[in-house]
């Protein structure tokens, strides 16, 4: 007996198929027909869940953010604020196959939003959530008395956000075969430098 899947699960399966197509063929290759074939669905079935291509791409981007947020929330507590922030920040980097695929999709759709107004809302939301995450990390350092006195929290949140984005872009550029451990060291050095 085939297992029935609910509407939300189908949405996620279609978004994951979208990710695979984007990683393999880029956003330009992510047509409704190609995504439906990747998911083993008819185009009509896909359109029943996502009436427009833009809605599918927007949901695919939102799912990247939801998955990253869930991973961060599931991290075990660390003994110090510095260790907590290092682990949270590292979780946002493409350090393994799954996170690498998510980051490739994130960057591709982030860029595609410049030409597609329907992707701008989820792109802007993703950017805002990243900035809020960076603010939270700086607040953790401050609350743990690990932030140097007189530190401009907003400026440091912007720097941390930019560092995470930059490291992620470099890791994607270097390819999956490259050793990503250097990025963890850069992150640890930066976060350590914020401590007073």
Located regions from the model:
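Generic hydrophobic, amphipathic alpha-helix propensity
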Residues: 7-18, 35, 60-64, 68, ...
């Amino acid at each position: 007996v085939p297992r029935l899947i609910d509407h939300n699960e189908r949405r996620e399966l279609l978004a994951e198929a979208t990710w695979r197509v984007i990683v393999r063929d880029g956003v330009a290759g992510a047509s409704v027909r190609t995504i439906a074939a990747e998911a083993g669905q008819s185009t009509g079935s896909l359109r029943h869940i996502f009436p427009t291509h833009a809605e599918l791409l927007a949901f695919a981007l939102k799912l990247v953010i939801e998955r990253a947020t869930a991973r961060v929330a599931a991290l075990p507590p660390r003994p110090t604020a510095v260790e907590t922030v290092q682990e949270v920040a590292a979780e946002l980097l493409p350090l393994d196959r799954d996170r690498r695929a998510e980051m490739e999709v994130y960057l591709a759709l982030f860029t595609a939003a410049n030409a597609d107004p329907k992707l701008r809302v989820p792109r802007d939301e993703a950017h805002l959530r990243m900035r809020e995450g960076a603010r939270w990390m700086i607040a953790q350092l401050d609350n743990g008395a690990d932030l140097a006195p007189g530190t401009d929290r907003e400026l440091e949140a912007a720097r941390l956000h930019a560092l995470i984005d930059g490291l992620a872009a470099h890791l994607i550029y270097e390819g999956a075969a490259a050793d990503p451990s250097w990025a963890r060291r850069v992150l640890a050095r930066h976060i350590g430098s914020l401590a007073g």
